[in-house]
Amino acid sequence: MKTIIVLSYFFCLALSQDYSESNNSTATLCLGHHAVPNGTIVKTITDDQIEVTNATELVQSSSTGKICNNPHRILDGRDCTLIDALLGDPHCDVFQDETWDLYVERSSAFSNCYPYDVPDYASLRSLVASSGTLEFITEGFTWTGVTQNGGSNACKRGPASGFFSRLNWLTKSGSTYPVLNVTMPNDDNFDKLYVWGVHHPSTNQEQTDLYVQASGRVTVSTRRSQQTIIPNIGSRPWVRGQSGRISIYWTIVKPGDVLVINSNGNLIAPRGYFKIRTGKSSIMRSDAPIDTCISECITPNGSIPNDKPFQNVNKITYGACPKYVKQSTLKLATGMRNVPEKKTRGLFVAIAGFIENGWEGMIDCWYGFRHQNSEGTGQAADLKSTQAAIDQINGKLNRVIEKTNEKFHQIEKEFSEVEGRIQDLENYVEDTKIDLWSYNAELLVALENQHTIDLTDSEMNKLFERTRRQLRENAEDMGSGCFKIYHKCDNACIESIRNGTYDHDIYRDEALNNRFQIKGVELKSGYKDWILWISFATSCFLLCVVLGGFIMWACQRGNIRCNICI
């Protein structure tokens, strides 16, 4: 019976600590941070899977599906390629003297004039596209002894045969085609683009019928360059009723230079020049519709917002656009490390601090206090720590955008079949650049995320240290982000701790007195198990001694007989 009494005493003593915490002479103050039930997973330098309370997506992965016509001037090419509009194909006359920021070529575009090729198609297309205008100035070339304004049934302008409006097809006059030698100086202060051509007849008969000579020659030169083209006579696949071809060439004449044209046949002469302007106009192949809206960034898929630093829509862009990366998602942490709140905390539902878990429900603040005292429980935010963290995180997204947004366009690059190896090299270089940028983007975001998490953890620790320095010996660090305050601390007292006006000297004597009284009977949780086990072992030992003594007493009285057989 004595053993049972002793065990009951120790058990009650072990539990007395829990109940003593609710004593009116003490209080508990816990520090915590914001938490959400379901956070967002982000990457850091040290961890690929870390949960935060909030994060912002940095990769734009979808377009509007339409091209916005503001603030950029968009010219819809409709049925005309840029080169057809440049040459003056009859069905492209509407584009004469047009200007643009972005010329949109459609997959439905077609040529509807004499079949031609441009040996340096990509360069001419890029040159005209970047110039941003089809402004054309007619000049008075003098072509003596030849017939001008040749036409073809393959190039109808209305019911009659026609030709490219910016070119002049010269043929024999009567039975002669004299040697032509024409000069045209550039007396202006800008570059001039002259477009000209050479006709390749399908047969020798066609050659002599048009130009008399069995073989023609065209030479176009300036002080800086010279091009000599000899026609290639021969049959080619029929296109719009023609097996002959025209090759289109171009020459840029600088201010103060002179254009010289020399030919004895097969010349497709220029009628004037195009003004070359330097700018950031461009061209893009796209079938996206053009709509009235505003967007700084345009891709072949349509316009996209540029409020993110990266995009995964298309590597061809125009305008101020996010940098293209391979990743479909990169999340920037804009909140702290998330530790979801535990819903059950044992029999007594004690409050807990940030080391155990976060607190849900702190919508307006990231850091705060919870307390338990004689007046009940409560919670309040710490605006100072919250604002300190937010100030450092705000602007992080804008800084990333400033570092990565391209203020120029990434144009399409085209090469002829002869330049296939250059095309392969260009593709390799572009792929390498994309790989490098994708890696840099992931590294940049991981670094920023690491900084954000370290920053928010640091602010939590600063708040804890600030509180600990205020309380000093009046409270004890419970090791879970909480303090046990050894004096009566009502709501006004708790508020003074939160706002930094707490005076520990006022409560020092009461706290020391209560600490000694409580410590006199308080058993630390670390010793409870030891005492219980020692009590149990002692009880068992005493029980065995009593049982052994009883057996020996009974044997002496003869009440118990023990026989040992060998």
From Swiss-Prot:
Query: Per its record, what are the GO molecular function terms?
Result: host cell surface receptor binding
Show which residues sit on the Extracellular side of the membrane.
17-530
Transmembrane regions: 531-551
Which InterPro entries does the record associate with it?
Answer: Capsid_hemagglutn, Hemagglutn_HA1_a/b_dom_sf, Hemagglutn_influenz_A, Hemagglutn_influenz_A/B
Q: Where is the lipid attached (S-palmitoyl cysteine)?
A: C555, C562, C565
Q: What compartments host this protein? A: Virion membrane; Host apical cell membrane
Cleavage (site feature) positions: R345, G346
Q: How does it sit in the membrane?
A: Single-pass type I membrane protein
| Modification(s) after translation | Palmitoylated.
Q: Which residues are modified by glycosylation?
A: N23, N24, N38, N54, N181, N301, N499
Assigned keywords, A-Z: Clathrin- and caveolin-independent endocytosis of virus by host, Clathrin-mediated endocytosis of virus by host, Disulfide bond, Fusion of virus membrane with host endosomal membrane, Fusion of virus membrane with host membrane, Glycoprotein, Hemagglutinin, Host cell membrane, Host membrane, Host-virus interaction, Lipoprotein, Membrane, Palmitate, Signal, Transmembrane, Transmembrane helix, Viral attachment to host cell, Viral envelope protein, Viral penetration into host cytoplasm, Virion, Virus endocytosis by host, Virus entry into host cell
Intervals, Cytoplasmic compartment: 552-566
Please give the superkingdom of this protein's source: Viruses
Tell me where the signal peptide lies: 1-16
Enumerate the Gene Ontology biological process terms: clathrin-dependent endocytosis of virus by host cell; fusion of virus membrane with host endosome membrane; fusion of virus membrane with host plasma membrane; viral budding from plasma membrane; virion attachment to host cell
Q: Which GO terms describe its cellular component?
A: host cell plasma membrane; membrane; viral envelope; virion membrane
| Disulphide bond pairs | C30-C482, C68-C293, C80-C92, C113-C155, C297-C321, C489-C493
Other information: Major glycoprotein, comprises over 80% of the envelope proteins present in virus particle.
Q: Which family does it belong to?
A: Belongs to the influenza viruses hemagglutinin family.
How is the subunit organization of this protein annotated in UniProt? Homotrimer of disulfide-linked HA1-HA2.
Q: What does this protein do?
A: Binds to sialic acid-containing receptors on the cell surface, bringing about the attachment of the virus particle to the cell. This attachment induces virion internalization of about two third of the virus particles through clathrin-dependent endocytosis and about one third through a clathrin- and caveolin-independent pathway. Plays a major role in the determination of host range restriction and virulence. Class I viral fusion protein. Binds to sialic acid-containing receptors on the cell surface, bringing about the attachment of the virus particle to the cell. This attachment induces virion internalization either through clathrin-dependent endocytosis or through clathrin- and caveolin-independent pathway. Plays a major role in the determination of host range restriction and virulence. Class I viral fusion protein. Responsible for penetration of the virus into the cell cytoplasm by mediating the fusion of the membrane of the endocytosed virus particle with the endosomal membrane.
- Which named protein is this? Hemagglutinin
